[in-house]
A protein has these predicted regions:
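Aspartyl protease active-site motif detector
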Residues: 31-33, 209-211, 220, 239
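A short mid-domain helix/strand-loop element embedded in enzyme catalytic domains
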Residues: 185-187, 213-218
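Short beta-strand scaffold segments in enzyme catalytic cores
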Residues: 37-41, 217-222
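Nucleotide/phosphate-binding catalytic cleft detector across ATP-hydrolyzing
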Residues: 1-207, 227-234, 277-371
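A mobile "lid/hinge" subdomain adjacent to the ATP/sugar-phosphate binding pocket shared
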Residues: 250-298
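Glycine-rich phosphate-binding loop plus the immediately following alpha-helix
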Residues: 57-65, 189, 218-262
């Protein structure tokens, strides 16, 4: 059973377990995502912000870092000779740098930085040295990027990272085999039909899936054979909601102190307050402020606009009447109120919805290697 962790204590326990596991082969699925990358590696899961920052000044000291959602990595040697001695930050460690790249702002980066993303995952999970990793990946345009991704990712790679428990720098070598590169959402369908979720759907029957991600709502109509019948993209996922709330906070006239005067509120801190369930912006008494009211107001506007577009698409195509299931996944379906709204519509909300595509991609890896 795949372990889904959500706090640092569990992460450290799992990082220690995996390092001492003696495993030599790992099967994985990686969903590069928009705001967050998600991966299932062996029986472990990981989710990190899809952000990258190159270490330009190699003379700086003590910059190495690691946490449950970010890491410093140095590529030592291996198949990617162009990366030899390159150091970079990934995830929250990259967001902490002033000159970071967000992958959703340039979709080409999802392909160009595919290896760096995987190495950061392996660092945070603290894999044993000498592992062979078989992995399936997703991409928004496999026809354009599949060969490039495979060229960049496959091979033997030696890298350094900070050990999560001992906090010393360790060196690991991994052999990576890419078993498949699939369109976005393909893994989710595989998980629904052939994985743990197992929707009972005949080849002639339809299901409508709604994937609420960081950047978009993606509607996919598929049949019991796994074939995609139709797709429709609605711009403005959960990240848009976070931005709306941040802008609403900008307009509030309740300055707590001179230090918080004219502050520009961060969507990522809004998201943090939602995830923690506190609906509080900021982590200290100088900036901390409740935003339940802004959440409720912005959510109504965000939801009503997009659910109307969803309804228009599924009814115009005559899919709604024919669908046996409405199913929802993606990190956005777990948002407070959104989960209830979807349930009221009769949607099946899958467990661990943000990991559905990665779980399905891992399943596709298992099928491809006969595991």
């Amino acid at each position: 059973m795949t372990a889904i962790y959500s706090n640092a204590k569990n992460w450290l326990v799992q990082a220690d377990l995996l390092a001492k596991s003696g495993l030599t082969d790992l099967i994985a699925g990686k969903d590069s995502g928009a705001g967050y990358g998600k991966a299932i590696i062996g029986d472990f899961s990981i989710m990190m912000p899809a952000a990258y920052s190159l270490v330009r000044n190699r003379n700086i000291m003590h910059h190495e870092t690691i946490s449950k959602d970010g890491a410093w990595v140095r590529y030592v040697d291996g198949t990617r000779l162009d990366l030899k001695d390159v150091q970079f930050f990934w995830g929250s460690a990259a967001l902490a740098q002033s000159d970071h790249t967000l992958l959703h702002e340039d979709k080409a980066k999802k392909a160009e930085l595919a290896l760096e993303s995987i190495l950061a995952d392996l660092a945070v999970l603290n894999i044993p040295d000498g592992v062979k990793l078989s992995i399936s990946l997703s991409n928004h345009n496999p026809e354009r990027w599949a060969d490039e991704i495979k060229r960049r990712v496959e091979g033997t790679h030696t890298f350094e990272h900070l050990h999560p428990v001992t906090r010393s720098i360790v060196t690991k070598t991994v052999e990576i085999v890419v078993t498949g590169i699939y369109p976005e959402g393909f893994g989710s369908i595989a998980h629904c039909l052939f994985g743990e979720a197992s929707l009972v759907l005949d080849p002639s029957e339809l299901a409508i899936a709604l994937d609420i991600g960081s950047s978009t709502w993606l509607i996919t109509v598929f049949n019991g054979s796994g074939a995609v019948i139709d797709r429709h993209l609605i711009e403005g996922g959960a990240g848009e909601l976070h931005s709306m709330i941040a802008e609403a906070l900008d307009k509030r006239n309740d300055k707590v102190s001179l230090l918080s005067k004219d502050v520009k509120h961060s969507p990522s801190l809004v998201n943090q307050g939602i995830i923690e369930g506190t609906f509080t912006y900021g982590g200290n008494h100088l900036t901390g402020k409740k935003f339940e009211t802004e959440y409720s107001q912005c959510l109504d506007q965000w939801w009503s606009n997009r659910i109307e577009k969803f309804a228009n698409f599924v009814t115009a195509g005559n899919y709604l009447d024919r669908a046996k299931y409405l199913v929802a996944w993606g990190g956005g379906v777990s948002l407070p109120v959104v989960d209830q709204n979807l349930a009221d519509l009769g949607c099946v909300i899958l467990n661990n919805p943000q990991f559905i595509n990665a779980l399905g991609l891992k399943l596709l890896t298992q099928i491809s290697i006969g595991a």
